[in-house]
């Protein structure tokens, strides 16, 4: 298996346990550049994107480029290799939803020029481009909208609610609640 990763905000030690595995090949690559992987490919998993608000607010143009050029490059690679591709999207495509819970036919309420707009729009464009490749080229695609991931090796200063709460608890601080505290979230442990 080959993996093409751009390591913005990722620590290599988090995947060091995979390096000795015979079936694992690691490629360090910027997906916004042309992607070539030698040999046959069955699947491409496109998870490249900053997901932390701390990161995507620092690198807004790169975030948009990964969602557009990076996705285009990986869809092109999938087409060239006759590979299936899974695109990791996000609940952020819904923006600040007016409907709870959101169904897949809900289009969302996104502020395209707001602070989160770069991430939200990168993912919305990524989904549209993926569907265009599917409909126009017949590429076998899947899109998964992942909600609020959390798990081991997550940075406590990530900018998302679970690491923020964990960091505050570990420091013996009160947990910061925004608004009236009645917000709901769906979480995905990874």
Where are these regions (language model features)?
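N-terminal Rossmann-like NAD(P)+-binding domain of SDR-like oxidoreductases, especially those catalyzing
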Residues: 1-149, 169, 179
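Glycine/proline-rich active-site loop of Rossmann-fold NAD(P)-dependent oxidoreductases
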Residues: 124, 139-140, 149-164, 171-173, ...
């Amino acid at each position: 298996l080959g993996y093409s990763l751009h390591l913005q905000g990722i620590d290599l030690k988090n995947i060091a346990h995979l390096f000795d595995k015979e079936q694992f090949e690691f490629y360090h690559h910027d997906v916004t550049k042309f992607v070539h992987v030698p040999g046959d490919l069955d699947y491409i998993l496109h998870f490249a994107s900053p997901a932390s608000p701390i990161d995507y607010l620092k690198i807004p143009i790169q975030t948009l480029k990964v969602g557009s050029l990076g996705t285009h490059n990986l869809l092109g690679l999938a087409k060239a290799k006759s590979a299936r591709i899974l695109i990791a999207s996000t609940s952020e495509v819904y923006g600040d939803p007016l409907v709870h819970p959101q169904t897949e036919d809900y289009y969302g309420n996104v502020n395209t020029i707001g602070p989160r707009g770069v991430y939200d729009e990168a993912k919305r464009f990524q989904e549209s481009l993926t569907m265009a490749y599917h409909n126009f080229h017949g590429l076998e695609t899947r899109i998964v909208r992942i909600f609020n991931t959390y798990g081991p090796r997550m940075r406590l200063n990530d900018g998302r609610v679970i690491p923020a709460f964990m960091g505050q608890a570990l420091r013996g601080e009160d947990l910061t609640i925004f608004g009236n505290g009645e917000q709901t979230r769906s979480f995905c442990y990874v």
